[in-house]
A protein has these predicted regions:
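Macrodomain-like recognition of ADP-ribose-binding/processing modules
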Residues: 1-134
């Protein structure tokens, strides 16, 4: 996992890098990492998947009032992991998804990303790695 840590602050993307952010099911990218994702092509109204040089993983419902349960977030993370597997030439910088506006702790979200351990093209926040490898 050495060298596969997402920087705490991402201000620019190198060629082939994808910014992976927490979104809502309405695709309203108005705050947090979702708002930052607009800089790199996130599409207003698109909740999940590849959007420009970004990839959305919903953690809130369409109304943005309800935080999705872990079991509701899990399928979106599974889809992301499959996407990363079939796109090895892209490097995915996963942010602290679900740990900002959705108020989860890394210990809650990190286990969803265990499937990326062997994927060299996925970088996770150090807080996620600590929980996955503990």
């Amino acid at each position: 996992m050495e060298g596969r840590v997402t920087p705490e602050l991402i201000e620019d993307l190198a060629e082939g890098q994808v910014f992976v952010f927490g979104s809502n099911q309405g695709g309203k990218h108005g705050k947090g990492a979702a708002k930052t994702a607009l800089t790199w092509g996130a599409k207003w109204g698109q909740a999940a998947g590849l959007q420009g040089r970004t990839y959305g993983i919903p953690t809130k419902d369409k109304s943005i009032r309800r935080v999705l349960r872990i079991d509701e977030i899990a399928p979106f993370v599974d889809d992301f992991i499959e996407f990363a597997k079939v796109n090895p030439k892209l490097t995915f910088l996963v942010t602290l998804i679900g740990c900002g506006l959705s108020n989860y702790k890394p210990k809650n979200i990190a286990p969803l990303f265990k499937g990326v351990i062997l994927l060299d093209n996925v970088h996770l926040p150090k807080q996620f790695w600590h929980k996955i490898l503990a």
